[in-house]
Amino acid sequence: MLSDKQQAMVSIFEKHVAAEVAGDLETTLATMTDVPHLHNIPTMIGGYGRDGVRAFYRDHLVGQFFPPDVKMERVSLTVGDDQLVEELVISFTHTRKIDWMLPG
């Protein structure tokens, strides 16, 4: 059972992911802390601070996040008191350039 704080974190996370997929940059950023940081392990790119994360999302993610046939299957969701970790299996047809995941 999740605490109220943990449930609030999950709700914000779900809003964040929905905004990413919908291409809504402002809502995506509104779900983040005042000094967000984003680090994508596969390509070692991302951003730090509101301006850096905004630029990364604008140039690489929001509105061009995934091809139309993307499927996301949650493997696990671990929620602590101050962090949330989601493990996913993502599948899609590589029909366009996706710099942050598969460069070139």
Can you name each region flagged by the protein language model?
Residues M1-G104:
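C-terminal and inter-domain tail/linker signature
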